[in-house]
Structure formats: C-alpha cells, structure tokens
C-alpha cells in the first residue's frame, strides 16, 4: 500500500494518503488510533494504549480504493440499510467525508466529519470522542427520513471462543428472511446475519482468546445487527478473515431517523 504524508495538522494529528483515500492519523489521549479514512466514514483501527490488542478490526487485504466500502473499522450504512436500493447499505460508506473540526488535549480528543451533497448541503455528521472510552455519534441532517447503522467491526482472537451477551432470544434472520428463536448469550459457529430489536441498550462481547470483554452502550438505537460471514466469500476479506472479526451494529432500521436525530455507541474495554 502506498502511503503519503499530505499535511501535519497538529503534532499528534496528521493527514496521510493510503492509496486513493485521505486518512487522518492520530496517536494521543490514551488511544492509539491509526486510521480515520475520510470515506465511509470509518474509524479503522484503534485501542486504548494499555490494550494488548486492537479493539477494532481492519481487513489485512483492504485496498483503500475509491468506490469500495472499507472492510473494517466503523463504516456508516446510510441513508438506507441493506439491499433495498443500490448500492447496498447506502452511499455514505463509499463517499468522502470532510474533517470539519478537531480538538486534542492530554485526556480527550474530539474529531468531527461531515458529509455534503453535490450542492454542498450538509447531509450528516459523525463525531468521535476518545477518553478512556470511544464514543461515536452519527447525526442525520437530510430532509427525508433515513435508515442508519454504525457497522462496527470488532477485532477478536478467535470466533470460536466468543460469546455475545445482552441480546434478545428472537431475531430476524436476513439469510432466510425469517423470524427465529435464538440462544442468548450467542455463540458464532456459522454464517450469521441477524437483526435484533434493541430491547437492552448494553451488550458485551466476551473474547476468551484475548481474555477481555468489549462493552457496548448504545444510544437511541432501535435495532442491533450481528454479522459474521463465516466461510462465505466476501469482498475485501481473506478466506480466514472471518475468524478474527465480529460485527455488532448500532442501528435505526425500522424506526427511521428524522432531521437532527442522532444515533451513537460508546465502546469500552474490560480486562
């Protein structure tokens, strides 16, 4: 991958080019945050400085090419979810966002990115706040109601040693288009693409291989989406990539976002 330094914004924050994509890169405030591609919008890799492993996952074969959704981090599915229109999961995850504001101190970092229409009208904003936790907030500014999902890819040690806690015992299985009863806590042993009702705004990913728990606190979500492609061939991923990742998405699918409404998730690490 070709990487070029474009601009130094502060001693801690740099704008670099990874192949086709401009990427703000940050290291400070208790978090090592390697990439914020201005496309998607996706925080690619990050972890508290005292963490032994990254919290977020990025595909080792990610090409950082225009027109392709980034396979990893937190791409934004917006203004629609799924394949109801093309491209699947909306246009926001394949468009360039603008870094509009940044604040950096010893104990806190705040970055804001905005998405504009062809007429230079703001459509959406993403803010990322890093303290000892990571707080991601998406705000919808479009005139029409919209769906949205924070498609978070979590880095795990071994998919066979993961337990997802706090999910309901029923879900909509997108693979067979049926409502199903499922166990909770949930273990992953096959291709999973399930939409859950957001009955409990807190989930935990128990990662036994890395001996840690990733805690999620969702705000203003109506659904969660649990996804792992297993052996299914997936663009932007290696054949074994599924073994090291799990997506648990904070979503507004059936209850649409109205102008000015936000959707957010707080991510923290235990262990």
UniProtKB/Swiss-Prot annotation:
Residues the record marks as active site: 151, 249
Biological process, per Gene Ontology: carbohydrate metabolic process
MF annotations from Gene Ontology: carbohydrate binding; glucose-6-phosphate 1-epimerase activity
CDD domains: D-hex-6-P-epi_like
One Pfam family hit: Aldose_epim
Swiss-Prot/TrEMBL catalytic activity: alpha-D-glucose 6-phosphate = beta-D-glucose 6-phosphate
Residue sites binding substrate per the record: 71, 93, 193
EC number: 5.1.3.15
SUPFAM superfamilies assigned to the protein according to its UniProt record, in alphabetical order: Galactose mutarotase-like (SSF74650)
Coiled coil spans: none
Keyword vocabulary terms for this entry: Isomerase
Protein family: Belongs to the glucose-6-phosphate 1-epimerase family.
Name under which the protein is recorded: Putative glucose-6-phosphate 1-epimerase
Species assigned in the record: Haemophilus influenzae (strain ATCC 51907 / DSM 11121 / KW20 / Rd)
Phylogenetic placement of the source organism: Bacteria, Pseudomonadati, Pseudomonadota, Gammaproteobacteria, Pasteurellales
């Amino acid at each position: 991958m070709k990487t070029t330094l474009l601009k130094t914004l502060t001693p801690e924050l740099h704008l670099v080019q990874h192949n086709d994509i401009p990427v703000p890169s940050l290291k400070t405030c208790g978090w090592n945050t390697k990439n914020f591609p201005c496309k998607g919008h996706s925080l690619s890799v990050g972890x508290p400085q005292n963490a032994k492993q990254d919290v977020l996952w990025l595909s080792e074969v990610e090409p950082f090419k225009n027109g392709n959704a980034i396979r990893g981090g937190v791409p934004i599915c917006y203004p629609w979810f799924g394949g109801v229109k093309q491209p699947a999961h909306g246009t926001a995850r394949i468009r360039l966002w603008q870094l509009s504001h940044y604040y950096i101190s010893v104990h806190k970092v705040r970055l804001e990115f905005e998405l504009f229409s062809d007429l230079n009208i703001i459509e959406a904003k993403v803010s990322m706040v890093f303290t000892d936790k990571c707080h991601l907030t998406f705000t919808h500014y479009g005139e029409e109601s919209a769906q949205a999902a924070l498609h978070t890819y979590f880095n795990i040690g071994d998919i066979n040693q993961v337990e997802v806690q706090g999910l309901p015992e029923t879900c909509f299985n997108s693979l067979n288009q049926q409502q199903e009863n499922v166990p909770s806590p949930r273990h992953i042993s096959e291709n999973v693409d399930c939409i859950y009702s957001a009955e409990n705004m807190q989930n935990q990913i128990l990662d036994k291989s890395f001996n840690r728990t990733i805690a999620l606190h969702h705000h203003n979500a109506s659904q969660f989406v649990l996804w792992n492609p297993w052996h299914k061939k997936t663009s932007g991923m290696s054949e074994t990539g599924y073994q090291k990742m799990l997506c648990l998405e904070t979503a507004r699918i059936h209850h649409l976002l109205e102008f000015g409404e936000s959707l957010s998730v707080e991510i923290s690490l235990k262990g």
